[in-house]
Amino acid sequence: KRKNNIAINRNLSEQAKILYKEWFIDFGPFEGEMPGDWHLGTVEEIIELHDSKRKPLSGRQRDDMEKIYPYYGATSIMDYVDNYIFDGIYLLLGEDGSVIDTEGYPILQYVFGKFWPNNHAHVITGEKGFSVEMLYLLFSLTNVQSIVTGAVQLKISQQNLKTVEVVIPSYEAITEFDEMIQPIFREIRRLRTENDKLTTLRDNLLPKLMSGELDVSDLDI
């Protein structure tokens, strides 16, 4: 079930990326040309950064905490902690360490609910009508190799991130497209939530089965 949900979500994400490329890179619905009321701008115009609210926790601090809310690093969940800083839908973009994939695209995490990020990922929401979902698609299709600094420890600074050139559509186009993709991302969130519950159930039941505390030998399966 979990593997199936992961595969479905991967497919849903790819569908959304194809739609974004068709609209905002290939300009398919607009006869292959960028409409006159759109413009080339920079990332600074369309994002809000929440990095100042981040707070890293040491391994020792986390060891003493109850494991409730995800603690995010640059690329993934690193641990679970007993409190949270953010509650909602956000985009995490790797700031240092593993910041790009082998092709130069940024490492992204589409996160929702209550969570605590460390200081290795930028915490982003949208401006000018851009939803987090649209930003996720935009950055998924934007090569950022040229703004990465550092030879040993790679880094995408706030300043450099803000300079990335992007197509900024009209508010009407943004709204219309966002209405198309929101059902896709609602399903992605639903399936991820279902997987989280399945994982919790497995983690709770497995030790009991292994220890013999839970006996299923009499179940008619």
Regions found by a protein language model. Give the residues of each.
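DNA target-recognition domains and sequence-specific DNA-contacting regions of bacterial/archaeal
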Residues: 34-35, 39-169, 220-221
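Non-catalytic DNA-recognition/assembly elements of restriction-modification systems
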Residues: 1-56, 61-73, 167, 171-216
